[in-house]
Structure formats: structure tokens, C-alpha cells
Amino acid sequence: RIVFSGSADETVEHYMKINSQHLMPKVEFLSSEEALGNEFIKLKSVKVVPENPFITDDIYLQFSFWNLTGASTINMAFDLLGLNDEVVFGSLFEFTTTENNLCNATCKIPANLMNDGVFYLNLYFSSTEMRLLLKLENIISFEVVDVKRNNAYLGKVNGAVRPKLNWIEN
């Protein structure tokens, strides 16, 4: 049975829209007992704000987790992946643990950097000696939405990122 018929680009877009109905832009746990993780790290929450960003929006990735290692600092890195599992970019941050073992931080992805599409986040927690403590794959997923364009260009702009670059005519 044929479910969809169209060009390759139309087919990819069709299935991306179907998959976007199953996006999970946040994951939250109320207590460390129910949270994802292990004896070292328990995930409290990961969120993308706004949940359905446009390419022209600043995108905030908010992270919160319990550091159960006893160390005062802990590293967390993420890879942002596209629909085809290609790494768009990654980042690392050294968290300082609070009195209640919580670590909280927000990463800002500037407006006009991301192209439209569906993205996933992998998380990696490590000690300051870079010993891997926990890896969480595809922990959240979200779609960055294109804005209406005023020019006659049709179709998706190439690339995973779409930075608004400064051009100087000379």
C-alpha cells in the first residue's frame, strides 16, 4: 500500500511532519528517585524554550540535574543532531554543584543560526578528569520552524545551520 507519493524532497518533508508530531521538547522529573540516570548523575530536566522556535528566535536549552558524585564541579556536554544523525554542533559546560547537589544552567543558541528542521539532543556527563559518568541519547527533540520569506526562493535552504552573515558590498 502506498502511503505517500511525491518527489524526494516532498517525501522527506511529509515524513518529517509526521515525526514532528512525536517531538519531545522537554523531559522533567520531580525527584531524583524517579529520574533518568545512575549512581553518579540523575537528570531533573532538559527543556528547549520556546518549545517550537522559529529560525529567527533565540533558542534556550535549559539543563538541571543532581550531581551525586560528591565533586564540587561536573562537566556536561551535548551534541545537537539533525534528522539524519549528523552532529550539527556540540558544547561543553563545567557546572558548579549547589548545596542540594543540583546543577542548573541555560545555553543560548542565537537567533538566525539554526536552519529549519528537526533536531535531537545527546547529553554526556563527565568528571573534571573527563571520565564518562552518564550518556543520554535523544533525550529531547524539537523542530525549528522557518519563517515566511519575501523573496521568490522556493525550497529548503541548504545546511543544518543558517547563520545570518554580515555582507559588505565593496
Model-predicted regions and their roles:
Residues 1-170:
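Localized sequence-composition bias
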